[in-house]
Amino acid sequence: MKKSFSILLLAASFFYQGQTTKEEILSNLNQTGGVYYAYPTPTKKLTAVPSGYQSFYISHYGRHGSRWLINDKDFSGVMDILRKANEYNALTENGKSALKRLENIWKIAEGHNGDLTELGGLQHKQISQRMFKNNPQAFGNNAVVTAKSTVVPRCIISMAYFTNELTANNPKLNISVESSDKYMKYLNHHTKESIDFKSQDNFWQEEKRKLKQDALRSDRFIKNLFNNEDYVYKNVNPEKVVESFYWIASDMQNLETDISFYDLFTKDELFNIYQAINYQFYVNDAASPLSKGLVKDNAIPLVKNILEEAEDYIKNNKSGASLRFGHDGNIAPLLAFMRVEGMDKEEINPREVYKVWNTFQAAPMAANLQMIFYKNKKNDVLVKFLLNENEVSVPLETKSFPYYQWKDVKAYLEKITKSN
C-alpha cells in the first residue's frame, strides 16, 4: 500500500489540479473568452529526459489557431443596431465610442468569416519551433512526417504554418500534407447519437437557456450604451446586444489590435456570461455526465488512429511525427476520453462547472495534445503527454512522471476504446 501510494505521488505534477476560482479566471479577462482565449505560451520548464533515452516520434492533435468570428453578422449585426440608434440620437457617449470602435474593426473584419488570423498562424509556427527544438532526434533527415487536417480552411492553413516551420528547420524532412474528407471520420468524428443529444430539447437545454438568459440580462450594460429607454423597448433586443459584444470583446485578443471592448462590461458580467458559455461547451463537447459518455466517445476513432500510427512507427523503427489538425469540438472530447489530467472532471451543477473544468484550459486557440515517444538502445519505449505544451498525467502509475511505459499506455488506450 505504501509503495503504491508513493508511486501515485510521483505521478502527480498537477498542472490542472484543484478547483478554479472566479478570481483566478478574472485575473486575466482574456480567459473569459473560453474557446476564443488566445494560445497561452508555455512558461514551465520540461522535465529532463531519462538517461539513455531520446525522442523518436510525436503523435499530435491540434486545434486551428486564432481566428475571426465565424460570421460577418457577428460584427455587423450589433454595429447596425448602434448605427440606427445613433441616427435617432439614442446613444450615450459610451455608445458612440463603442460604435466608432466597431466601425474601425469592421474595416478589416468584413469578409473574414472564421478565417485564421495572423496571430493564429504565428501560434502554430511557434509551437512547431518548440517541438523541433525539444525533439531534434525525431526530425532527422530520414524522418517521416505526416500532416492531415479537416477540410476547413483555417485548419489547412494552420497545418501549412506548422509544417513550413518544420521544413525551415530541416529542409530535408519528408513531409506529406493532406486535407480530405477521407480523414474526417477520425479528425472530426461525431456520432448521430451525440448530435441528437446536443440538439434535442431536453432538461439540460432549458437549464442552459436560463443560465445564459440570466447572464445576459444587464440593465446597466444597456443604459451605458443607450440613452432612450423607449427606443430600446421598441427597437433593441438587449440580450442580443450584450452577447454580441461579449463575443466581439473576446475575439479582439486574436487580432493583435489595441481596440478593446472589455470596458463596456463589469467583471461580474463577463464572468457570468463566461460561466454560461463554459457550461454549454462542457456538456456539448467534454466530460459532462449528462451525456452519459456519448460526447467523449466521439474520440474513439481518433484514439484508434493514434494507436495504429504509433505502433507503425515503433514496429518499423521509423522516426518522425503524425500531425493532425481540427477543432475545439474534437480536442475536448479527446482529452475527456483519454482522461488527461483535469480534463475528465464531472459536475452536474451548472454554476459549479467552472470550478472543475474550463474551456480556456481545454480548448484555447491552437490547443494541442502531444504524445512524445522516447526509446533507448534496448528499444524500451517511454511516452509523455503534453497539453498545450505542459506536462500532464493520465490515470496510470509510473515511477518517473511525466514518463510512462508505452506498453502500459497502449494497454490502457486499447482497453478504453474496446470497452466503449
Task: Report each predicted region and the residues it spans.
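Bacterial Sec-dependent N-terminal signal peptides
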Residues: 1-22
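Signature for phosphate-centric chemistry
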Residues: 19-144, 150-322, 326-420
